[in-house]
């Protein structure tokens, strides 16, 4: 995670798979149990609890991703866009195509837990 001159708030049990944020003057806030995929670019936005941001997604200034959201790989969330809770978002620009199912909500949480468990397992052998 890289930032420059930005307020950064990251929630408990949030997984970052190498995202970068270099924008000034915006608050960057990530909720609890969030998975941020590889090569994601995030600029001064808010991501709600229990959300998954897919590989290569881009989330621009002042965008707000609700709780329990699934943002698809390579999705582009434009400036000031607000994504409601429980949304599946795909495309460029990103569009809500439907609410996520209860099974998808569970899968997002299980995905985050899987990475947390792996981190705990492998960090013991590294440190």
Please tell me what each predicted stretch does.
Residues 2-3, 7-8, 20, 26, ...:
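Left-handed beta-helix
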Residues 10-24, 30, 35-36, 40-41, ...:
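C-terminal segments of enzyme domains that contribute to small-molecule binding surfaces
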């Amino acid at each position: 995670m890289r930032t420059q001159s930005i307020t950064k708030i990251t929630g408990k049990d949030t997984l970052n798979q190498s995202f970068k944020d270099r924008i000034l003057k915006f608050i960057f806030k990530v909720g609890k149990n969030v998975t941020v995929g590889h090569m994601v670019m995030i600029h001064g936005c808010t991501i709600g609890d229990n959300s998954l941001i897919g590989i290569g997604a881009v989330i621009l200034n002042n965008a707000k991703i609700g709780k329990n959201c699934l943002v698809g790989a390579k999705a582009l969330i434009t400036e000031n866009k607000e994504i409601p809770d429980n949304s599946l978002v795909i495309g460029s620009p990103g569009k809500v195509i439907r609410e996520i199912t209860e099974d998808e909500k569970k899968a997002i949480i299980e995905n985050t837990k899987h990475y947390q468990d792996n981190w705990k397992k492998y960090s013991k052998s590294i440190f």
